[in-house]
Amino acid sequence: MEEELNMKALITGASSGIGRDMARILAKLNYNLILVARNEDGLTKIKNELETENNKINITIYPMDLNIKENCYKLYENEKNIDVLINNAGFGLFGEFAETDLEKEITMINTNITAVQILTKLYLKDMIKKDKGNILNVASIAGFMPGPLMATYYATKNYVIALTRAVRKELKKKKSNVKISLLCPGPVDTNFNKVANVKFKIPGLSSEKVAQYAIDKMLKNKFMILPGTLIKIGKAFSEITPDIIKEEVAYHAQKRKRG
């Protein structure tokens, strides 16, 4: 499927993993791109790659840390007119809550929650005025259950899920043509694992497959995007299982990641 020229998508966390692969997919659909990440080298590399492959599109990069909320406002002021917003930036930390670094957790909350809150609200207001646009918030299957040994990360993803569900209902009630979607992947082979200092015991999906699935479903206005059969089963498990059992399952799952 080939989209019209001059459509514009903003992707955070675009220098690697799912965000980078989403950029590749949207570039093939002739979207102009605004790519945001802390890693300037990674952004420059993907920009050069995509411009070489498609000279019809414009790509703007913003090497900035969305943990700093002023950067979120600055980004919006510089790039107001977009058609697609993908809130993908985020990271996790492993360890018992009493022992993990508080400053790193505050940074995680700012990145995983505050940046999503700010960008979703600012761009949603504009999209509602135009009565068109798509927002894709990247959460995690982790957001459907408590997460001992990654307590703060699981909590941030639960926030994103709850927020996105509520916004979707508000849009439906006002019969808006603006669509919001929620991507909840499980294990994915990305740089996330290195940052969180964990290793998945079950094979992760490739970031390319997750990105392709997510973009396809978002453009079809699918709300809950669950890539892979195991993730769909995991979501169903979370809905019928008592919290005390989910806590125990999550604890042992995290424990196995560190051996």
Where are these regions (language model features)?
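Residue(s) in the substrate-gating loop at a strand-loop-helix junction
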Residues: S140
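Conserved NAD(P)H cofactor-binding loop of Rossmann-fold oxidoreductase domains
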Residues: N88-L93
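Conserved glycine-rich Rossmann-like NAD(P)H-binding loop of the short-chain dehydrogenase/reductase
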Residues: L29-K45
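Substrate-binding pocket helix/loop in short-chain dehydrogenase/reductase
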Residues: E96-A98, K104-I109
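Active-site helix of classical SDR
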Residues: T120, T156
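C-terminal helical subdomain
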Residues: L182, K199-K235
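Conserved glycine-rich cofactor-binding loop
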Residues: S15-S16
